[in-house]
């Protein structure tokens, strides 16, 4: 039996009477032909009732009351008999039948009920895992994935608790990724997809083609991502070099290429952006321009605006200034335009690659920082000594 302390109570009548009333209510719909009494065993009785729940949103004004009533009965089913009941419930209370956005929609109602069921099965890991998967899919339909605790740390903790096999982990990560994308959370979706690819090794990397392609696609189109070299180190992505050379070339382009490289690539592969990356080319043009600016900033911290306009294929007017402002706002670079000198002064920038050279540079900067802090500490100590000597 599930932990009923985790669920609200929806009916104050005995189970048999409640089951009969549910059957009587559901039989109001012409397509439902339930026996008025049903099997004596609660589990079998509920399986029959749950098999009709796919039609409930079509006619009932009391979807929430009916689902809550049924869920209060499901949790009293003994543990060894509850799995078929839960299977029937989540099969028929799914995004295929429960639609809408937000808590007030049919999908939102289903999210609330599934959440209660999920909490009630904390001691039954197999059942709880199934409910969680259904909950993620329903959250995607209702655009409520932000309300579900599904960050990577939490997911890994759950996988350990449930002892989820690798393929099961991948299935859940794919579902979370889809839900995040639907809810316009591309940066989080990219992290989830990277974690998914991390489950592959060199032994099975060749089987990860679809996941690897989706990982690259999600990362490239994410407006907040500017560094992609970490993807190159994943076995599943490395395998794209032979299984899908075009996608791998696109990844390399966004790792280190420029606007000119991108334009040449698109000229050779005109349908790649729409067919493979499935994104408006305007978005990618802005992305590659930002990346090109970051590359220029790595080479020098003072860039002539005329040169910048040429490299970015943007008119050297207010349009260029607006682009630079956007670049600063998304933290691609930090700096300011010197209108008198007609230059862009770059004070800092994001690295497109973070390899050994960048680690060496970081080490040098940290050493300088530590030395400065020591000098400041010594100066303060000397001042204190002088004050005490007065």
Swiss-Prot record:
GO terms for cellular component: COP9 signalosome; eukaryotic 43S preinitiation complex; eukaryotic 48S preinitiation complex; eukaryotic translation initiation factor 3 complex; eukaryotic translation initiation factor 3 complex, eIF3m. It is found in: Cytoplasm. PROSITE patterns: PCI. Pfam families: PCI. Keywords: Cytoplasm, Developmental protein, Differentiation, Initiation factor, Oogenesis, Protein biosynthesis, Signalosome. One of its GO terms (biological process) is cytoplasmic translational initiation. Residues 188-351 form the PCI domain. GO terms for molecular function: translation initiation factor activity. Disulfide bonds: none annotated. HAMAP family: eIF3m (MF_03012). Component of the eukaryotic translation initiation factor 3 (eIF-3) complex. Within the eIF-3 complex, interacts directly with eif-3.F. Component of the CSN complex, composed of csn-1, csn-2, csn-3, csn-4, csn-5, csn-6 and csn-7. Within the CSN complex, interacts directly with csn-1 and csn-4. Component of the eukaryotic translation initiation factor 3 (eIF-3) complex, which is involved in protein synthesis of a specialized repertoire of mRNAs and, together with other initiation factors, stimulates binding of mRNA and methionyl-tRNAi to the 40S ribosome. The eIF-3 complex specifically targets and initiates translation of a subset of mRNAs involved in cell proliferation. Component of the COP9 signalosome complex (CSN), a complex involved in various cellular and developmental processes. Belongs to the eIF-3 subunit M family. This is COP9/Signalosome and eIF3 complex-shared subunit 1. It comes from Caenorhabditis briggsae. The gene is cif-1.
């Amino acid at each position: 039996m599930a932990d009923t302390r985790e669920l609200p109570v929806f009916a104050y009548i005995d189970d048999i009477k409640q089951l009969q009333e549910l059957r009587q209510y559901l039989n109001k719909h012409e397509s439902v032909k339930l026996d008025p009494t049903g099997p004596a065993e609660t589990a079998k009785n509920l399986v029959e009732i749950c098999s009709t729940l796919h039609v409930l949103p079509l006619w009932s004004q009391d979807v929430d009351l009916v689902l809550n009533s049924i869920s209060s009965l499901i949790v009293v089913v003994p543990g060894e008999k509850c799995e078929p009941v839960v299977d029937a419930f989540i099969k028929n209370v799914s995004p295929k039948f429960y639609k809408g956005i937000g808590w007030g929609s049919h999908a939102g109602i289903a999210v609330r009920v599934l959440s209660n069921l999920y909490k009630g099965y904390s001691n039954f890991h197999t059942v709880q895992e199934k409910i969680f998967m259904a909950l993620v899919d329903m959250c995607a339909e209702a655009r409520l994935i932000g309300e579900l605790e599904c960050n990577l740390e939490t997911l890994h903790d759950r996988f350990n608790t449930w002892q989820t096999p690798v393929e099961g982990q991948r299935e859940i990560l794919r579902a979370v990724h889809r839900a995040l994308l639907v809810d316009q959370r591309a940066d989080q979706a990219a992290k989830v997809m990277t974690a998914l690819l991390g489950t592959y090794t060199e032994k099975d990397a060749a089987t990860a083609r679809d996941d690897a392609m989706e990982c690259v696609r999600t990362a490239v189109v994410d407006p907040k991502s500017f560094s992609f070299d970490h993807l190159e180190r994943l076995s599943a992505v490395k395998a794209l070099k032979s299984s899908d050379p075009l996608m791998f070339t696109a990844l390399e382009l966004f790792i280190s290429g420029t606007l000119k490289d991108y334009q040449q690539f698109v000229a050779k592969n005109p349908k790649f952006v729409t067919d493979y990356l499935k994104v408006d080319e305007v978005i990618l043009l802005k992305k590659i321009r930002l990346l090109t600016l970051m590359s220029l900033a790595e080479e020098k911290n003072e860039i002539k605006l005329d040169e910048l306009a040429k490299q970015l294929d943007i008119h050297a007017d207010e349009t260029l200034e607006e682009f630079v402002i956007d670049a600063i706002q998304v933290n691609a670079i930090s700096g300011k335009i010197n209108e008198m000198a007609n230059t862009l002064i770059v004070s800092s920038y994001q690295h497109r690659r973070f390899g050994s050279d960048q680690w060496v540079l970081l080490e040098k900067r940290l050493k300088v920082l530590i030395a400065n802090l020591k000098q400041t500490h010594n100066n303060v100590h000397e001042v204190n000594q002088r004050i005490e000597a007065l």
